[in-house]
Amino acid sequence: KGAPFYDRDGNGVYDPNVDTPSFRDADCTATPDVCDANADQVAWYVINDLDEGAVQSLYGSKPIGLEVQNTVWGYARTDALGDAIFKKYKVIYKGTETTPDDAVIEDMYFAQWSDPDLGDFGDDFAGCDTELSLGYVYNSVDPDSHYRTFDLAPPAAGYDFLQGPIVEAEGEEAIFNFRKRSGFRNLPMTSFVFFAAGSAISDPDLGEYVGTEQWYNLLRGFQPQPDIFNPVDFVNPLTNQPTKFTLDGDPTTTSGWNDGIPLPAGDRRIVLNTGPFQMALGDTQEVLIALVAGISSEAPPRTVRTTV
C-alpha cells in the first residue's frame, strides 16, 4: 500500500538503502528504464467521490463510485528532467451500492484544470501546442513583479499529456501500466480551453448541478454553458471558425491565434481535455501528465516547449 516502489530484494518491505521509488507493476524486463528511473521523491494518495455531501457541494452531481489513485514523482537534477513533476492518475470505476452490474459510463473525459497564477496573476497569457498535447502559461510582460525580486526572467509552465486513456484501435499499440498493449491507442489532448477571471467566460458555478453541465461542455471543448445538447463553440477571432483548441498559435513567431486577442493579459484558467472513452463497472484507466517549467532568456513559451 502507499507510494509504489521497485522491491529489488523481494522482501515486500520498502528499504531506502536497497529499493527504488518506482512502479511495482512495471515490466522491468521489457522496460528496465522504468524500474531504474530512480525518482528522488515519490508520493501517493487515493481519493474517491463517495462523500455525497462533499461531492454535491462542488458541482451538484451525486457520487458514481470513482476511485482515483495518484502517484506523483520527481527528480533532483539540474537538467530538463529536474524541471518536471510527473503525475499518474489511475481511475477505477468501482460504483456505489446501487450501481447495476452492467453499468457503463458511455462518454467519459479526463481534464487537467489549472489556475496557474504565474508570479503576478494579473499579467498572464495562456496557450496550447496540439502536436505536443501541451497547455501552458507564460508572462505577458518582462519583467514580472514577483520574479524581478530575485532578478529572474519570467518563466513559463505547462501541462503535457504524456499518456492518455486507451481506446480500442485495431493494428495500433498503446501504453498502459508501463506496458505495451496491442489493439489499443492512447488518446491525445482532444481539446484545450481557457478563460479569464472576470470575463464573460468564467469558472463553472459551484454548488449547483448547472456546474456539472457547464463542466461537461468544457470537457468536450465548448464554452461552459449549461445546455449540453446545444453547446456553444469557442471561435477563433482570426478565422471566425469554431475551434476546440483555443490559443493554438505560436507566440514566439506571433503566428496564429495567441493570447491577448481579444482579451488583455490577466488571471487565466486553462483546461486540457482528453476523451471520450468508455468505462464499464470495474474498468481501470490511466492518464500520465507532466508538469513542466522553464526559465530562460529565450521567449518563455519556447522554453517550456523545449523542456517537453
Protein language model regions, located:
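Extracellular/surface-associated beta-sandwich interaction domains
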Residues: 1-308
